[in-house]
């Protein structure tokens, strides 16, 4: 494929503590081409430059999952509001023994991602059309997952209400943010206490090429989430906790 797509493997080794295999590098490139092709009919991403895509979709997705990259990890992840498949698809490529559920409320996007995952040979990916509020109240999904990821979905307090009900006790959620303020941190602490969790890590970094600021907020579920949460569809965003 001749698209200018290239991974700075040395940089990834230094910043992520992990190096993709040649097969994984091919899958990342195929993911790029698949997303660009799908972007012609679906609003998947505004990022189409290969170098920017590599930094802001691939590297950024994996930065929040650094603890899993060197651990030969084999748990179950749910990517909530996956949109164009980030961070779920990069996670599925990197974590070959994991199982990744891509959840989104837009059927056309989910149908596209299902086809793309098959084209990439990702047998560890499943997809579903749904809302996090509904899934968090479904007995088959509630308290099921080891990790949850959520990026570009809404305020951190809302993301916490989407994620924590779906996690097992001891499970973790990664909230991908840009800037992070003290006001947001205080509100999130209040919300996760209500939901049966705690904030266990706030990792600040800068993207390796553009220098854009990023924060990954890691939550851990420490107790069963009260049955009242998540609230009905729309309420978490209309009346955020915290």
From Swiss-Prot:
Among NCBIfam families, the record links this protein to: rsmG_gidB (TIGR00138)
Annotated protein name in UniProt: Ribosomal RNA small subunit methyltransferase G
Q: Which InterPro entries match?
A: rRNA_ssu_MeTfrase_G, SAM-dependent_MTases_sf
| Entry function | Specifically methylates the N7 position of a guanine in 16S rRNA.
Its Enzyme Commission number(s) read 2.1.1.-
Per the record, the gene is rsmG
Question: Major location, coarse class?
Answer: cytoplasm
- From the Swiss-Prot or TrEMBL record, state where the protein is found: Cytoplasm
Q: Name one GO molecular function term.
A: rRNA (guanine-N7-)-methyltransferase activity
Q: Does the keyword Cytoplasm apply?
A: yes
Keyword set for this entry? Cytoplasm, Methyltransferase, rRNA processing, S-adenosyl-L-methionine, Transferase
Gene3D superfamilies (alphabetical) = Vaccinia Virus protein VP39
Q: Which family is it part of?
A: Belongs to the methyltransferase superfamily. RNA methyltransferase RsmG family.
Record the organism. Answer: Synechococcus elongatus (strain ATCC 33912 / PCC 7942 / FACHB-805) (Anacystis nidulans R2)
Enzyme class per UniProt: transferase
Q: Where does S-adenosyl-L-methionine bind?
A: 81, 86, 104-106, 132-133, 151
Keyword match Membrane: no
**What is one cellular component GO term in this UniProt entry?**
cytosol
